[in-house]
Amino acid sequence: MKKPVLVIMAAGMGSRYGGLKQIDPVDKEGHIIMDFSLFDAKRAGFEKFIIKKENEDSFREAVGNRMAKYMEVSYVFQDINNIPEGFEVPEGRVKPWGTGHAVLSCIDEIDGPFAVINADDYYGRHAFEAIYNYLSEHEDDDKYRYAMVGYLLKNTVTDNGHVARGICTTNEEGELVNITERTRIEKRDGKIAFTENDGETWENLPEDTLVSMNMWGFTRSILDELKAEFPQFLKKGLTENPMKCEYFLPAVVSNLLEADRATAAVLPSEDKWYGVTYKEDKPVVVEAIRNLKKEGLYPENLWEE
């Protein structure tokens, strides 16, 4: 069985954050959030990671160069023009095609199981251990065997604005039944709520709702499925919302679950999630990292020179 690799989804400039938030240091040693993810990933057993090539120079300077002696690094393009024959990129569109397309862009670099994370989210040590162990112990049989790390909604919202989250429903076996992408969730009057109509109406969500933070574990089979589904997505998306439609990775997983062709084990995380959606979130992350170091979960310098 091939060793699992790690795919890091790094978007471009953070539209809500204002700048390349993935390479903004979160401690006095100059580490960025991704350093902590890679440290946890290596500790769990990962030996290779893949990241977008567009920001290669910035990432090499921030992470790649110091990581090269600890882990193998591959850079891949997520090219907006890389779409199936018969389709055209709408004139003026600059927005990438979304998480499904980002993972599909890595197809030539992946030859076995892999995990997927966001570059700018702190997932915690247990999450990497759980996903690595799952991928090392499970293979496809009569169904695709995938996994996802689940977080409590209350641990994943910010005080500084709205966030997008995948809301999860599970069965008695702790497997994912479906996942619904809510693109605008925020704290309102002491409760957590979402809107689907630009704030005209709001619906409350329980604090202990399980959500996806885009930490997935897959066998290589998902790449074939992403490739097969992409034309269908484009047909619909380019008609309904040509400038902004996104090919969401969880939507493809949901389709496979509904068709009973895959299972996705939900691995509950004991770790609190931290992330920087807005500039105002940064002090919270800095304080959290400081406390995690105090508790002995991380050394002061992650990568000893």
Residue ranges and their predicted role:
Residues S58-F59, H126, E225, V252, ...:
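Phosphate- and divalent-cation-binding pockets in alpha/beta enzyme and binding domains
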Residues M13, D120-D121, L153:
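Active-site metal-binding loops of divalent metal-dependent hydrolases
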Residues I23, C168-T170, V266:
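A structural signal for short hydrophobic beta-strand segments in well-ordered beta-sheet cores
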Residues G217, A264-L267, G275:
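Conserved active-site beta-strand element of glycosyltransferases/polysaccharide synthases
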Residues R125-M213, R220:
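Conserved core of the sugar-phosphate nucleotidyltransferase
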Residues L226-R261:
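A C-terminal functional module that forms or caps the active site or interfaces directly
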Residues M1-A11, H31-V116, Y123-F128, S136-E137:
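Conserved N-terminal catalytic core of the sugar/cofactor nucleotidyltransferase
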